[in-house]
Amino acid sequence: MPMALFRDAVATVPAYAEFLRRNAIDPGRVADPAAIPLMTKQNYHQVFPLSERCRGGRLESADIVALSSGSSGRPTVWPRSAADEEAVFARFEQVFADGFRAAERSTLAVVCFALGNWVGGLYTLGAVRHLAGRGFPLTVAAPGNDLDEILRVVGELGGRYDQVVLLGYPPFVKGVIDAGIARGVDWPAYHPMLALAGEVFSEQWRELVASRAGADPVTDIVSLYGTADAGVLGNETPLSVRIRRFLASRPDVSAELFGDARLPTLVQYDPATRLFEEIEGGTLAFSADGTVPLVRYHIADEGGLFPRERLIERCRREGFEPGDGPDLPFVYVFGRSLFTVSYFGANVYPENITVGLERPDVAEWTTGRFVVRTLEDDDRDLVLNVVVELAPGAEATADRRAVAAESIRRELGRLNSEFAHYVPADRQTPDVELRPADDPEFFPPGVKHRYTRP
């Protein structure tokens, strides 16, 4: 696909031809995909006008646009056509047909992603309606991320179907499950299934949520891996979940396979529509056709690839039989590299937090350095944690923690449109820790500072 897509983009996309010219690439001399320069949001999408990145230089060839938020909070526009979404619909069909058996069970699908032009809600609503149009006995409800409306829909309609599928960001859907339990919802009676996206979650989290919902953790809880740029790129299958659960129980094998103590999301993908590459340094790129073609697009997600048989054979050598599953390769993903953390599906950028710490009532007793990360509390709920470095001699007080937390919350909501729309209001205030200057754990002197941590 890369060479065919490359030649087509050269011939039909004005911005891509200019992109190659600026990189001193003669497209007629390119015979090896490795010679094609990597495309990024910074060197391509933010450089060339939107219409010139579309085929024929025509934005009006798109059927719809979706929005995602960049580091400045200014939305990025992603044009789509119906043809672009066929590859995404195939991934949803694999989840609903193979995992949830929704082709043979009447299903109420409840879209819990934020609605509007935001990419998650648009894609999900379109994909699930497509399945209904294909003959699945499936009805879609789209309350968005309105907790009361979600529970009202489930309560009024859920009992009329064989099963209910909740689609949303993992921490938000867990909040729906927990709120329902508090209000007396008998989740097992609805035979719930969960289709999740936007976060890496632990197998302990999956087990906890499955137990509260009365769901099977292997077949009933599925993670989708996607980006605003190209939609769903891959999805968990019962095979990938079984392997991941085994690796969670064998951290020694996991660390050897993935080169990291963290357990990544593990999904399968179709190389005919989304062809991944592992770039030197342990990040991912992919090629995908669409209204805005992406040729060796470097998304900077940390991760890598495994051929199907290689990963299965390794499991067998360790005494674990993973069983059957799709004949598709695996991609594993840790998430964004050094620059962001994902929280309720929103990319939280250090630049946004910096502004909160630059307000006069905070800047006078902080250095401006911080570390942002997501943690799980004792109830496996996701928490946005910000460790802030105090100015030399400044004291850590409860009042200062509260002031910093509120300042960060206010600026995140103002600057980052994803954060404002995706994160529930009662989860938007971060947990702030105040550490002394040059704290050895978070702010060691003489070391290049990292503003995010996994």
Regions found by a protein language model. Give the residues of each.
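Nucleotide 5′-phosphate-binding alpha/beta core
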Residues: M1-T107, V111, R160, V383-P454
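Active-site glycine/GP-rich loop and adjacent strand/helix microenvironment
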Residues: A4-L5, R134-P454
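Short, conserved acidic/polar surface loops in the N-terminal third of protein domains
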Residues: V77-S81, V88-F89, G120-T124, I177-A179
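Alpha-helix N-cap/loop-to-helix initiation residues
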Residues: E85, N117-W118, L147, S202
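Conserved coil-to-alpha-helix start sites within the AMP-binding
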Residues: F113-V128
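Ligand-binding cleft/hinge of the Venus flytrap
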Residues: R129-G133
